[in-house]
C-alpha cells in the first residue's frame, strides 16, 4: 500500500474474532491472529481475484488453522500466505505491511 500507518483494530478484539475483514481506500484486506502473532493480507484469492470469505469475517477453516477461499476451497498458511492446497497451489496471498503496539494493530496504506 504505502508507508503511512493507520490504526486498524484493537488487539483484544482481533484475538476474540481470530480473523476480521476491513476496507481501506477501496482495498479489501483482512487480519488474522494466530499463536500470539498478527498477519494482514489483501482479501483476494490469487486464483480468480475474488474475495476469500464465505461470510463476513470468516477467513479461517473449521480448525482455525488455515485461511480458506470459499469459492474453490484453496487453503493458505496463516503465517506465510502460501497456498498449500487447491487450484492456486504454490501461489500466495499478498501480505500487507503491519505492526503492533501494546493496544492496536496498524497497517501501512
Name what the model sees in each region.
Residues 21-108:
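Rieske [2Fe-2S] iron-sulfur-binding domain
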